[in-house]
Amino acid sequence: FIWKKHRFSIFLPGQHQISNAVTALAAAEELMERLPSEGRRKLEPGENARFIPAADKRLGWPEMERGLANARWPGRLELLGERPYTFRDGAHNPDGARKLAQFLEKHFTNRRIIYIMGVLKDKEYEKMLAELMPLASEIYTFRPHNERGLSGEVLAACAQRFGVPSHCCQDVNEAIRRGREKAEQEDVIVICGSLSFMEEMED
């Protein structure tokens, strides 16, 4: 994308990441304008720029371009594998679920979407399901290992009200295994609902 006549590349999937990137660029530009043109200070004899704190280095358009190009965000539309495509996304509110659904609808039209989902009981999970279930072929639910985790049975029952075949599992790894067993190579598996269970996932 182009912002203020500068071309930027980002590798974070999802149209909303462009808006996030523009916000970050605006903040960086404000910081850049506050710094002297030569940077915070010049190098002393014998100093190596690699060991100077980031705030003491010059910030400019090349640094901003490299920063965005190198940005990665684990757990946000993170591609874990292909054939079938497998994504991990920490969307845990209706807005995040809506952005996830928009991404899937744009890039995976006419493909079967299999959700692996666990949520916390204090989240608006019914509204999240309302965003996600119109695209769903199946859903495998589980309770995250968290005292606030919602029962997988409750989540499955809610999903069934949208007419989606729902299966309750013991944990995220069982849900992933069963989802993969059911998926064809052209399907899409989406692991979502919370960031809290990411560390529970086996490699």
Predicted features and spans:
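Generic C-terminal helix-cap and adjacent flexible tail
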Residues: 33-37, 181, 203
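C-terminal helical cap/extension that packs against the catalytic core
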Residues: 39, 85-87, 94, 129-188
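Active-site-proximal loop/hinge segments that shape catalytic or ion-binding/gating pockets
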Residues: 194
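Short aromatic-centered micro-motifs
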Residues: 1
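Nucleotide phosphate-binding/pyrophosphate-handling subdomain across enzymes
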Residues: 4-138
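Adenylate-forming
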Residues: 197
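Short glycine-/acidic-enriched loop or helix-start segments at secondary-structure transitions
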Residues: 97-98, 125-127, 151-152, 200-203
